[in-house]
């Protein structure tokens, strides 16, 4: 529910629209959304993972990305926040990091920067 309260863009705003019309249904909405919220399952992630966050993301607010990262169960995890980036979360700047990550974890080799 954090993203819904922090974000005023669609698709999250559609849930806010619904709750404005039916505030009494908030508990049911929260219960249903828990089935779809990745944060609820983050502790199950045990494989190596990289997470990139756009600090100006108005679709998935950075606060939710940090919360997700904190809850990830994997010991081998890396966080890459990108200032000045929105929902694309530094995709073009991040591609070299992704390439090195997959080379290391899928191909078993290190790639120099």
Protein language model annotation of sequence segments:
Residues 1-25, 81:
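Hydrolase active-site cap/lid region
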Residues 102-113:
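Short, hydrophobic alpha-helical segments
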Residues 47, 61-70, 79:
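Short alpha-helix in the alpha/beta-hydrolase fold that links the catalytic acid
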Residues 55-60, 88:
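Acidic catalytic loop of the alpha/beta-hydrolase fold
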Residues 25-41:
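Active-site nucleophile elbow and catalytic-triad environment of alpha/beta-hydrolase enzymes
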Residues 79-101:
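Histidine-bearing beta->alpha loop at or near hydrolase active sites
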Residues 44-45, 72-74:
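Short, conserved loop/helix-junction motifs that constitute active-site signature segments
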